[in-house]
């Protein structure tokens, strides 16, 4: 597909990116029309895609997109969340019209509804999830470009780009490569220097993880702002130790005599009278006849 030109051949840097994003990893199942893009099958049953065929079909898709006179007539669609960010980035760099999220049925066939559109070319992320726009495009004769896995159906698909469309990194990388080749064919960017847009911008990010990272960044920034510039500035020593000593005259009297004199004097508490001591220990003092007391008390009952 490169036409014998070395400048259009697959570079080692692009192959490294594809291998890192697992673009060559297919699924265990394989459609009979996708067998021509399968390189081999591993022992665990997973099919391996031929990256050379992937690059050739990517260049063909880029040429088809460049052939459209108005870039806004190219519709890029992704119903799956992992491809929505890549679709929006691709549209922002190439001028295409993005449809990220749910596709409104009848947007290509029902002329009554307000969402009716007439695109000239359709690029979808997954033929499985984006089957509705592919079917409607077949009704109105719109060519379709699709990123297809080994198990993806090729019904109504005109240009199939074999790749791993289940991995967020693989989907982001393929949209990034397609956008770069489109801009190169248009002459917007040169081929020799690398594209200054990093591929990370096309990767899907989980909203919860992104929120956690943002919250962690805010907390770290707040901690840095609250921390003093110099750790020892807050505890700088005084010039003289005598400046920090409080005079003893303000805290205590001059002598012990004055201190004792300053203590208030209280009168001693009166002592209780001592009980009389009896000479005879056998007879307690003040003892009465207990038997007489009991008899008197019982008689009163």
Curated annotation (Swiss-Prot):
Biased composition (Low complexity): 264-278
A Pfam family matched in the record: Ribosomal_S2
Domain of life: Eukaryota
Subcellular location: Cytoplasm
UniProt keyword Ribosomal protein present: yes
Record region (Disordered): 237-301
A single Gene Ontology CC term: cytosolic small ribosomal subunit
Keywords: Cytoplasm, Ribonucleoprotein, Ribosomal protein
GO BP of this protein: ribosomal small subunit assembly; translation
GO molecular function: structural constituent of ribosome
Function: Required for the assembly and/or stability of the 40S ribosomal subunit. Required for the processing of the 20S rRNA-precursor to mature 18S rRNA in a late step of the maturation of 40S ribosomal subunits.
HAMAP family: Ribosomal_S2_euk (MF_03015)
Subunit structure: Component of the small ribosomal subunit. Mature ribosomes consist of a small (40S) and a large (60S) subunit. The 40S subunit contains about 33 different proteins and 1 molecule of RNA (18S). The 60S subunit contains about 49 different proteins and 3 molecules of RNA (28S, 5.8S and 5S). Interacts with ribosomal protein S21.
Name under which the protein is recorded: Small ribosomal subunit protein uS2
